[in-house]
Amino acid sequence: MNLIMTILTITAALSLILATVSFWLPQMNPDAEKLSPYECGFDPLGSARLPFSLRFFLVAILFLLFDLEIALLLPLPWGDQLNNPTGTFFWATTVLILLTLGLIYEWTQGGLEWAE
């Protein structure tokens, strides 16, 4: 218990010292030249963001969703060693059916069409 209190005291004191020193140090105010973006010959006044395809975003989200589904279903073969494997297989089948219905819905709505 004494060791824990010593470590807590040291960390609290060190945190207080660092906070005090950072408060006392002068704040650096960079000039406008340092705040401007460096673009090596390009006009830095244009938009820094490129347009992002919403369809690509949807496909990426679907990929992550099905990738997570595979990661969740990987331990399923060891589910038959449980006392009640039917419950495990029931919920795994339910998840697969829900994801399949969602995929069919996206497909029928045209969300998976890459080109319009």
Curated annotation (Swiss-Prot):
UniProt main location, coarse? mitochondrion
Where is the protein situated, by its record's location annotation? Mitochondrion membrane
Question: Its membrane topology, per UniProt?
Answer: Multi-pass membrane protein
Any Pfam family from its record, for instance, is Oxidored_q4
InterPro entries tied to this protein: NADH_UbQ/plastoQ_OxRdtase_su3, NDAH_ubi_oxred_su3_sf
EC?
Answer: 7.1.1.2
Q: Which residues cross the membrane?
A: 3-23, 56-76, 87-107
Q: Which family does it belong to?
A: Belongs to the complex I subunit 3 family.
What's the stated role of this polypeptide? Core subunit of the mitochondrial membrane respiratory chain NADH dehydrogenase (Complex I) that is believed to belong to the minimal assembly required for catalysis. Complex I functions in the transfer of electrons from NADH to the respiratory chain. The immediate electron acceptor for the enzyme is believed to be ubiquinone.
Name of the molecule in the record = NADH-ubiquinone oxidoreductase chain 3
Source species, please?
Carassius auratus
